[in-house]
Curated annotation (Swiss-Prot):
Involved in peptide bond synthesis. Alleviates ribosome stalling that occurs when 3 or more consecutive Pro residues or the sequence PPG is present in a protein, possibly by augmenting the peptidyl transferase activity of the ribosome. Modification of Lys-34 is required for alleviation. Its main location: cytoplasm. The modification N6-(3,6-diaminohexanoyl)-5-hydroxylysine is found at K34. Pathway: Protein biosynthesis; polypeptide chain elongation. It is found in: Cytoplasm. It comes from the Bacteria. This is Elongation factor P. May be beta-lysylated on the epsilon-amino group of Lys-34 by the combined action of EpmA and EpmB, and then hydroxylated on the C5 position of the same residue by EpmC (if this protein is present). Lysylation is critical for the stimulatory effect of EF-P on peptide-bond formation. The lysylation moiety may extend toward the peptidyltransferase center and stabilize the terminal 3-CCA end of the tRNA. Hydroxylation of the C5 position on Lys-34 may allow additional potential stabilizing hydrogen-bond interactions with the P-tRNA. GO terms for cellular component: cytoplasm. Transmembrane segments: none annotated. It comes from Psychrobacter sp. (strain PRwf-1). The keyword Plastid does not apply.
Amino acid sequence: MASFSTNEFKAGLKVMYDGNPCAIIDNEFVKPGKGQAFNRVKLRNLRTGKVLEQTFKSGESLEGADVVDTEMNYLYNDGEFWHFMHPETFEQLQADANAMADAKQWLKENGNDLCTITLFNGVPLSVTAPNFVELEIVETDPGVRGDTSGGGGKPARLETGAVVRVPLFVQQNEVVRVDTRTGDYQTRVSQ
């Protein structure tokens, strides 16, 4: 695998640090008035999700992580693992709860949601849900006319169990588009 020097560090770069695959979140080059220049780097451990801050002297290098991002369709959850299938090779893969993190609240079974799965040595480290998903509202209060003093929103439970804030005019059994990155309601979807 390639080696990356401190002058090649940038956000999004995947490197090995202390035997763990990490992604660089932030990189700041510091040149003090006296002494050697260094890089102050924030790393996210791809296995645990923990963020650590580390300094590297100029000229130091880190080994690149053998991490691959692949697009796969979500199939189902068997209670312990979430199962995915590659759309072209039909190869199946299973991810555990640690790899799923927040993505599990946005995926419905056999919904053909195309997820990005980060693999390290063939093992899923993280699953990223599609940016937007369309889900049906299974439970919400009816919007009462004139009840808008608090901003005009109400909670709604989606078919996957996730709860989002929706406008008062949205009713139960309607399909809405949700931004999975923020968890915000975007629009109603006509069927």
